[in-house]
């Protein structure tokens, strides 16, 4: 019964440190394996139009980071796969579940991407299960990520259908308004939902949404995530594809949700909004800081690698993280 499960979110949790066993935090290994590939960090910039484009994807792949290209320039996906493969890089794309996507997947047999993410708002559905099965039939070597979901039942069903990883999170993102528009979602209890889902998972889980600080990455891993998808922390960089806007002499970048009218091009079934974020500088600086902070987290966990984070104790202290602290 769900009412017996503790409900909390990232800001309510503090991890308890263990004895440090490394002489320098730089010795901590932040790498993670997904499928047959190892990546530098367990983070994924959200597959959103204002977060990633082909140039950002190529940069991430070249530097050893995982990425997922968004699905909103559909006709560009196949040429994108070829360009990445021609450069010796992995291809990681997104698909939806509409009828024409089946033909698209079949057309990839001659040059299959290493990763495909089935990307819809409510991933616990027959349409997603059928698409998983289709991809696995047509492209058996491709690693399939499916989502988004928010319950153990959903995780089990998608895994049983053939998904290699599931994406957990319904509406906790900064530009997602699903819980306001529909009354449903994991907003406000995303970390507890992750914990709940991970107990049922036999394959990797990707935590998606609700990440506001670098410490939230460590918390996600503690509660069962293999990787963490992040939107707002990756938005607003100089390289970000979001439109540059100047307000009162200050530069901002647009950041909007994948289910917003700005992405959809129409005001229909809108579950996202648009905000302006101050320009943050270069993406590589954020990635470096993220890695350094995660190395510090590993040192506090008393280990040398990410797995040590899974075994630390924690306390639930409501909203304690912001008591007198600012970043």
Curated annotation (Swiss-Prot):
Enzyme Commission no: 1.7.1.7
Pfam families registered for this protein in UniProt: IMPDH
GO molecular function list: GMP reductase activity
Active site: 176
Keyword Oxidoreductase: yes
GO terms (BP aspect): purine nucleotide metabolic process
Domain of life: Bacteria
GO cellular component term, pick one: cytosol
Main EC class the enzyme belongs to: oxidoreductase
Catalytic activity reported: IMP + NH4(+) + NADP(+) = GMP + NADPH + 2 H(+)
Binding-site residues for NADP(+), renumbered to this chain: 205-228
CDD domains per the UniProt record, alphabetical: IMPDH (cd00381)
Keywords carried by this UniProt record: NADP, Oxidoreductase
Claim: Signal is one of the keywords in the record: no
HAMAP family reported in the protein's UniProt record: GMP_reduct_type2 (MF_01511)
UniProt record similarity statement: Belongs to the IMPDH/GMPR family. GuaC type 2 subfamily.
Task of the protein: Catalyzes the irreversible NADPH-dependent deamination of GMP to IMP. It functions in the conversion of nucleobase, nucleoside and nucleotide derivatives of G to A nucleotides, and in maintaining the intracellular balance of A and G nucleotides.
Name of the protein this chain belongs to: GMP reductase
Organism: Streptococcus agalactiae serotype III (strain NEM316)
């Amino acid at each position: 019964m769900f009412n017996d499960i503790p409900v909390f979110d990232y800001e309510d949790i503090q991890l308890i440190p263990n004895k440090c066993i490394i002489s320098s935090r730089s010795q901590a290994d932040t790498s993670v394996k997904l499928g047959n590939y190892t990546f530098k960090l367990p983070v994924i910039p959200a597959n959103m139009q204002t977060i990633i484009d082909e140039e950002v994807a190529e940069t991430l792949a070249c530097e050893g980071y995982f990425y997922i290209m968004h699905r909103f320039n559909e006709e560009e996906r196949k040429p994108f796969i070829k360009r990445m493969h021609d450069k010796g890089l992995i291809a990681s794309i997104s698909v939806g579940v509409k009828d024409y996507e089946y033909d698209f997947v079949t057309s990839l047999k001659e040059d299959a991407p290493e990763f495909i993410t089935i990307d819809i708002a409510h991933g616990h559905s027959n349409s997603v299960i059928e698409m998983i099965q289709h991809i696995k039939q047509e492209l058996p070597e491709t690693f399939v990520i499916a989502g988004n979901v928010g319950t153990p039942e959903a995780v089990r069903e998608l895994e049983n259908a053939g998904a290699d990883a599931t994406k957990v999170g319904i509406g906790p993102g900064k530009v997602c308004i699903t819980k306001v528009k529909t009354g449903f979602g994991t907003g406000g209890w995303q970390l507890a939902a992750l914990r709940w889902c991970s107990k049922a998972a036999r394959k990797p889980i990707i935590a998606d949404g609700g990440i506001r600080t670098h410490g939230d990455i460590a918390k996600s891993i503690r509660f069962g995530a293999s990787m963490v998808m992040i939107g707002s922390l990756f938005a607003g960089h100089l390289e970000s594809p979001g439109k540059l806007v100047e307000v009162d002499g200050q530069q901002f970048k647009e950041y909007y949700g994948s289910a917003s009218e700005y992405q959809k091009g129409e005001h229909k079934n809108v579950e996202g909004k648009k905000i302006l974020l101050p320009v943050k500088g270069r993406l590589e600086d954020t990635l470096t800081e993220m890695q350094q902070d995660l190395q510090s987290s590993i040192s506090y966990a008393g280990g040398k690698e990410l797995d040590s984070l899974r075994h630390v104790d924690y306390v639930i202290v409501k909203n304690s993280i912001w008591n007198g602290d600012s970043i």
